[in-house]
Amino acid sequence: MKKILFVLFACLCVMTACTSQKETRTRAEQIREQLLTCDENSVIVVAHRADWRNFPENSLEAVQSAIDMGVDMLELDVQRTKDGVLMLMHDHNLDRTTTGTGNIADTNWEDIVKLNLKDHQGNVTVYKVPTLEDVLLMCKDKIMINLDKADRYFDEVFSLLEKTGTTNLIVMKGGQPAKEVKEKFGKYLEKVIYMPVVNVDKPESEQAIQNFLEELKPVAFELCWNNPESQVPAKMAKDLKGRSLIWYNTLWNWLCAGHHDDLALEDPDGTYGFMIDSLGARILQTDRPQMMIEYLRSRNLHE
């Protein structure tokens, strides 16, 4: 009897220690570990340009809103001003999303900071264009960030990551071949996660994936496909299981063979569920993060 009680007590101590360890890790560290360990027990939700339905895309307010709703990762776009300030904006010019005009690369930061952001319907708001540093400090310890368009000046981006202590937040991605990625970003890959983007409609896609597995062993692949007849996505679900997580985008038809967010309004099982159950998706980038999180929680696939 004493032996049984001792074993039970030891098990309780181990469970308590594990729980305590998880609680001491930041939210960002927990998500990063999920990536690094290829954890398939839940689905990572990525908010495309943050919560742009409620606030201007790539704004601090959209970022904070996404954090508050429980998003795991943000997809944010980086541009550089004429005087070298790294800032958030998708387009290379100011016209669509601000009250200004002209190319960002031809405009100094002191002029951009005077502008107001527009929402997705073109209405002028009170919100301002953020710098990348502003966003990194806001996100620190709270959420992962997928930086898009940042590879063009990644030396400068990395310096900013080190300055703010946020190298562990970042997922970089791109469509370059494995050897080129290794040559270009090799010195950063121990600190920053790199994820290849592969269009599986292309005949060379399977070889490209194999090259990455041999050269870099990426924690995840972003797969894009537009051909609903293709068997490659289902094959990748089997081939990559236990090796790399699979990321799919539910943004537009041509990225996901029609299994997009707006279709999920009526049929979440046929869109999100299909990608999770049939294609092995464990990372989903969405324009409807709140709806996706609610669906995943109903299936115990998200906290």
Regions found by a protein language model. Give the residues of each.
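Bacterial Sec-dependent N-terminal signal peptides
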Residues: 1-27
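Phosphate-group recognition and catalysis centered on beta-loop-alpha active-site segments
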Residues: 18-303
